Amino acid sequence: MGDRLLRAARGEVLDRPPVWMMRQAGRYMAAYRELQSKYTFKQRCEIPELAVEISLQPFRAFAPDGVILFSDILTPLEGMGIPFELVEHQGPIIDPPIRSQAQIERIRLLEPEESLPFIKTILSTLRREVEGKATLLGFVGSPWTLACYAVEGRSSKDYAHIKSLAFAQPPLLHQLLSKLADSIARYVIYQIEGGAQVVQLFDTWAGQLSPVDYECWALPYQKQIVDQVKARYPQVPLILYINGSAALLERVGKAGIDVFSLDWMSDMAEARARLGSLAVQGNLDPMVLLGSPEFIRQRTLEVIRKAGSRGHIMNLGHGIHPSTPEANVHYFFETVRQSAELIHLR
């Protein structure tokens, strides 16, 4: 059933949930590490043959119900006039960081056909490869999280620079976030037109905001993207992921998304009640996959049982840890595929 993930994202009741993993193409796989040793991260993201191969590695190994584009949330920034460097094992570096009116005014509206032609090539190739066997996912970064990188200049522990901008010069940050939202909306549409059937928005760092600041700095710009995309493609499900979302669950649906991707720090049953009619994705602690097969099965089935059969996509609550044994990943996928029978037998 190649459309299982698509059907779950639309809120349907299924015999068992579809399953994929955030960062399912990555360093935990020996096949990926072989390519990592030969090519830079930028090459792996932007050379279509490499990105397609990397995206398909976990599909061949584990047969997930979803295949996701191998890329990076910062990929569109260069097309907007925000250069960055991806440093292996350090993450992205934006130097100089974006902190002034003049810098924000120089940011261009993204023209993905011009600056990101490889993305459409990758997606269209993947769609042909997985058609009828899995759902193809695209993904983007959401404005608050992209702004965190742009303003801080790199990963941050306290987000001092962007919060200083928010609280001392709010019009400046609103201008930046709105520009980012318009460009990312274009990027989502471009991915859909390239073949993506579902698109996930990563607003990973929105969990660092208080509820009142989430409603000011993250939610409006998530909605700005969703509104523009839904005006063109109302039938395409959109997933939103926020790390550390426990304080925000009653608010995330206001963005107009179809599915909320839950981190592992919330109880699935309690989150379901708080999310209302939204479909849900998640939310196994990635570190569970470092445990014994029996423990992996127990915790996986517990999440599935609590989520229920309507509108649930099984996933981790964050990206898979690089040290995870591939055998444990295989066991996780097999457990989900057998979950209807296993839960019935318990």
Curated annotation (Swiss-Prot):
Subcellular location as annotated: Cytoplasm
> Which Pfam families does the record cross-reference, listed alphabetically?
URO-D
Q: Which SUPFAM superfamilies match?
A: UROD/MetE-like
According to the UniProt entry, what is the EC number of this protein? Answer: 4.1.1.37
The UniProt entry's GO CC annotations, sorted and at most eight, read: cytoplasm
**MF terms per GO, please?**
uroporphyrinogen decarboxylase activity
> Which keywords does the record carry?
Cytoplasm, Decarboxylase, Lyase, Porphyrin biosynthesis
- Tell me the HAMAP family matching this sequence: URO_D (MF_00218)
The family note in this entry says: Belongs to the uroporphyrinogen decarboxylase family.
Subunit (UniProt)? Homodimer.
Q: Which PANTHER family match?
A: METHYLTETRAHYDROFOLATE:HOMOCYSTEINE METHYLTRANSFERASE RELATED (PTHR21091), UROPORPHYRINOGEN DECARBOXYLASE (PTHR21091:SF169)
Task: Please state what the protein is called.
Answer: Uroporphyrinogen decarboxylase
Gene responsible for this protein: hemE
